[in-house]
């Protein structure tokens, strides 16, 4: 079924259609760039009518019709609009960018309004239309989908690319709303005007009422203010106010000067970083002195005062200083004096909150004292430091000795640390130094209390170890202590703690001695009745648990034999005592040359 459109009468009268389009375009919310009404200045439907394809006929009669059509239009119709826009290219560009990628600056303090003319042409439409016609109710046309395919937008800003693209996108969006919502209402009113005489009469009456409306706009500055003042701030009476001319500028200058100054300050604050800037959305103020931030406001959330900020800085500074001191193994005084932390420098330079500085320093001193006390107590009670075996050139130094070196000798004289059975992988600390079980250890650098035994420089490493073993294995009655008087002839018997200490000191040092050195050392301290295992050469060459057990057994046998000799007769003890005392005077190495050959060993 074909339709013949009589297109010429529709082209002839388009004034009413222009008015309806203007009303429809201004009804919907406009973008912020458009600052004036949109006026349709020209509407030309062109010479090519649209094409309709019948899909369904629902109702067909003489006075009514209902059907579904497929419409397509590719004619030469065009539409010209005029409006005013705010010409701020940077603001227009930023409105197209995402918020997270734009700093939102302003290009100008005030907007610049420029007239804009837009022409819409090359309109392409395609969609499904529901058409209902009735002589009493007029023509109703509804689009089931968005019919706008494309159009061309020509404007005054075609030379600016991003403004042209922005206008193209915005106008396409407005036209899609126009076709879906406003165009059916416009067509329906036009059909009623042409078909229904009653609607024509109602419309004529509305036009007459609009023309007779002579309501003038009210000027807020036309009436005199209540607290009128002159240019110098003096109040005016009613007679002076009535004498003024309403058209002159005197009536406008009679407003309160206080309010005018406040309005001027408010206007100027929008262009500066003044503290009087009111609350603006998406704005960050450099200073804020609002009511909730004051101390006397009683707000639920406590404000960050200067003292609280300094306490926060002190907390972070103390944590940093504590971590650095633990990592370096230095004392608390060295950390505070040599490397001041962030909190101490901040408090010293700015002079903020002395109370917070004292609490910070007290906390740091308490932390340092606790670390030192733990290490001192650990070394004095157990004498065991659980760490891995270190090689011979060890560089680790005890923290206790570095903190309090002057109190080391006093603690040696007073405290006797208990010992435990030697275990592989353990490190033992005694009064004379520290040693690692299972690995050779160097002689401690600090001088012992009875130092004349090692006064001459040793020539052979084994000789120094023999001197060390001789000093530790011999009973306490034969030792010389420079701090003890020599008037006493009798000595107390050897204690169990000293015996175990001698065993620990003897075991790693005798391991590197040859068998003849061990035999000569045994001949100095005991009669030739000491029993030794027949395979001593094999055991001396091989290390491990068997060698340590044999060394302990030999030391116990030596101590037992010495105790028996002491109990037998005092006459045999005095020559041995004088023999031992001649060693420091004549030198240890001279006495070693007089050592006889080792006696025979009995199994």
UniProtKB/Swiss-Prot annotation:
InterPro entries: Mdm34 (IPR027536), SMP_LBD (IPR031468). Residues 320-332, 452-463 have a biased composition (Low complexity). Residues 320-511, 558-603 are annotated as: Disordered. Residues 1-205 form the SMP-LTD domain. Residues 371-380, 558-570 have a biased composition (Basic and acidic residues). One of its GO terms (molecular function) is lipid binding. Its main location: mitochondrion. The keyword Transport applies. GO terms for biological process: mitochondrial genome maintenance; mitochondrion-endoplasmic reticulum membrane tethering; phospholipid transport. GO terms for cellular component: ERMES complex. Residues 333-351, 383-403, 500-509 have a biased composition (Polar residues). It is a multi-pass membrane protein. It is found in: Mitochondrion outer membrane. Keywords: Lipid transport, Lipid-binding, Membrane, Mitochondrion, Mitochondrion outer membrane, Transmembrane, Transmembrane beta strand, Transport. It comes from the Eukaryota. Lacks alpha-helical transmembrane segments, suggesting that it resides in the membrane via beta-sheet conformations similar to those predicted for other outer membrane proteins and porin. Component of the ER-mitochondria encounter structure (ERMES) or MDM complex, composed of mmm1, mdm10, mdm12 and mdm34. Component of the ERMES/MDM complex, which serves as a molecular tether to connect the endoplasmic reticulum (ER) and mitochondria. Components of this complex are involved in the control of mitochondrial shape and protein biogenesis, and function in nonvesicular lipid trafficking between the ER and mitochondria. Mdm34 is required for the interaction of the ER-resident membrane protein mmm1 and the outer mitochondrial membrane-resident beta-barrel protein mdm10. PANTHER family: MITOCHONDRIAL DISTRIBUTION AND MORPHOLOGY PROTEIN 34. Belongs to the MDM34 family. This is Mitochondrial distribution and morphology protein 34. It comes from Pyrenophora tritici-repentis (strain Pt-1C-BFP) (Wheat tan spot fungus). The lineage of its organism: Eukaryota, Fungi, Dikarya, Ascomycota, Pezizomycotina.
């Amino acid at each position: 079924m074909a339709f013949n459109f009589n297109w010429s009468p529709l082209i002839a009268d388009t004034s009413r259609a222009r008015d309806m389009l203007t009303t429809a375009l201004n009804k919907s919310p406009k973008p912020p760039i458009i600052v004036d009404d949109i006026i349709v200045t020209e509407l030309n439907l062109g010479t090519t009518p649209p094409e309709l394809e019948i899909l369904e006929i629902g109702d067909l009669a003489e006075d009514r019709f209902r059907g579904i059509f497929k419409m397509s239009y590719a004619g030469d119709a065009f539409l010209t609009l005029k409006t005013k826009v705010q010409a701020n290219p940077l603001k227009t560009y930023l409105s197209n960018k995402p918020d997270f990628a734009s700093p939102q600056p302003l290009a100008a303090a005030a907007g610049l309004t420029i007239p804009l003319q837009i022409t819409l042409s090359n309109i392409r439409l395609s969609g499904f239309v529901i058409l209902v016609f009735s002589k009493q109710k007029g023509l109703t046309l509804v689009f089931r989908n968005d019919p706008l395919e494309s159009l061309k937008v020509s404007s005054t800003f075609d030379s600016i690319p991003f403004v042209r693209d922005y206008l193209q996108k915005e106008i396409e969006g407005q036209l899609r709303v126009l076709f879906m919502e406003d165009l059916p209402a416009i067509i329906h009113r036009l059909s009623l005007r042409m078909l229904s005489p009653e609607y024509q009469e109602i419309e004529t009456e509305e036009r007459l009422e609009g023309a007779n409306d002579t309501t003038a706009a009210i000027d807020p500055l036309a009436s005199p203010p209540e607290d009128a003042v002159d240019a110098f701030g003096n109040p005016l009476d009613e007679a002076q106010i009535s004498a003024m001319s309403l058209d002159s500028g005197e009536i406008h200058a009679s407003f309160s000067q206080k309010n005018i100054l406040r309005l001027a300050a408010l206007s100027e604050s929008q262009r500066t970083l003044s503290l009087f800037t009111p609350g603006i959305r998406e704005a960050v103020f450099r200073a804020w002195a609002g009511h909730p931030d004051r101390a006397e406001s009683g707000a639920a959330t406590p404000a960050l005062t200067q003292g609280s900020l300094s306490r926060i800085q002190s907390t972070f500074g103390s944590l940093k200083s504590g971590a650095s001191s633990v990592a370096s193994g230095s004392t608390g005084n060295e950390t505070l004096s040599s490397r001041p932390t962030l909190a101490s420098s901040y408090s010293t330079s700015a002079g903020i909150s002395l109370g917070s500085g004292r609490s910070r320093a007290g906390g740091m001193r308490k932390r340092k004292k606790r670390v030192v006390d733990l290490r001192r107590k650990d070394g004095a009670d157990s004498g065991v430091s659980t760490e891995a075996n270190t090689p011979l050139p060890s560089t680790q130094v005890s923290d206790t000795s570095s903190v309090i070196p002057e109190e080391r000798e006093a603690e040696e004289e007073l405290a006797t640390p208990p010992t435990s059975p030697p275990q592989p992988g353990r490190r033992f600390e005694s009064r004379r130094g520290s040693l690692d079980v299972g690995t050779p250890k160097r002689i401690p650098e600090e001088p012992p209390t009875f130092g004349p035994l090692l006064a001459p420089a040793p020539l052979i490493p084994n000789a120094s170890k023999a001197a060390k073993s001789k000093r530790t294995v011999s009973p306490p009655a034969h030792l010389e202590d420079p701090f003890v008087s020599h008037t006493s002839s009798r000595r107390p018997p050897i204690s169990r703690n000293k015996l175990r200490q001698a065993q620990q000191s003897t075991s790693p040092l005798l391991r590197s001695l040859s068998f003849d050195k061990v035999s000569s050392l045994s001949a100095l301290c005991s009669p030739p009745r000491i029993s030794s295992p027949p395979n001593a050469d094999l055991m001396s060459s091989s290390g491990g648990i068997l060698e340590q057990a044999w060394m302990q057994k030999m030391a116990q046998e030596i101590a037992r034999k010495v105790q028996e000799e002491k109990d037998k007769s005092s006459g045999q003890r005095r020559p041995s005592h004088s023999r031992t005392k001649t060693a420091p005077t004549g030198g240890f190495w001279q006495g070693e040359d007089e050592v006889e050959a080792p006696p025979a060993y009995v199994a």
